[in-house]
Amino acid sequence: MNVVELLGLPALEEHLQRLEPLLVESVVTGDGFLDEVTTHLLAAGGKRLRPVLALATATSGSGAATREDLLGAVAVELVHLASLYHDDVMDEATVRRNVESVNARFGNLVAIVAGDFLLARSAEIAAGLGTEIAALLAATLGELCQGQVAEVHSAFQVGRSQDSYTDAIAGKTASLMATSCRIGALTGGLRRDEVDAFTLFGRYFGMVFQVRDDILDVVGTEAELGKPAGQDLAEGIYTLPVLLALADPDAGPELGPLLGQPLGQPERDKARSIVAESGAIGGATTVARHYAELAASAAVSGPSADLARAFTRLAHALVDDLPAD
């Protein structure tokens, strides 16, 4: 999915071209080894989704990105990158963005400290943008950690509730999407009601994004995902499709005995097959579509009709290609 093309906002491409050197500049120290570690995933690319949200929101009224707008986008992307460094250590992942993960290449200790370094740089940038943005980013880091801890705490719990799942993804994913939009709205000088509206869009968009990701973890391939498929199942992270399958009177009795323990590849494949063939995928898609509609409703409250249409397209694009059943 090419996010910039989908949004149909021509100036965004130029903004992102200006963003890339700032991202590199923000993490380069002059220490050759540390620079190699901190730029590893930057060099691998990525959708830059959170900076896109920040920049699209910031420029919704003027169309021109200021240095403050760009630095706000850098700050949220560094938080996202740091979370990937830490997540891959926790998951013992070996692949990220179709390249070696940082922990696989440099070791867990280096990956953890490098992730901390990225967070420190993000905080430093946010401090330069004012106390409101600095406090917002700090609060978001707390939400990210709370969501991640909630997910880890529920690992291998076959009786995990859907509310537990919703709370976890609201923290670990939706919070940073919301903050990306809010920081963009703040650096862009939008009215307070517009700031709040775009923040709400970002939160609902983040919920759609994570539910979609969890569906694709079941039905997607490693080539499509850029990481091994079924990784959450193997690690005991039971996401919405799995929880819905467990509640299904036909799939649940077959799936339940497989879970509650680490899964080898054969068991992982069998569990994915059970979930995919149940009605759980359609049920999860319905939830994703609900969040997409909420996101679209929030977007129309902004100052730009073009951006409202663009954000609505983006939210709908996340669900348009999901399987209905």
Language-model region placement:
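All-alpha prenyltransferase/terpene-synthase fold signal
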Residues: 1-325
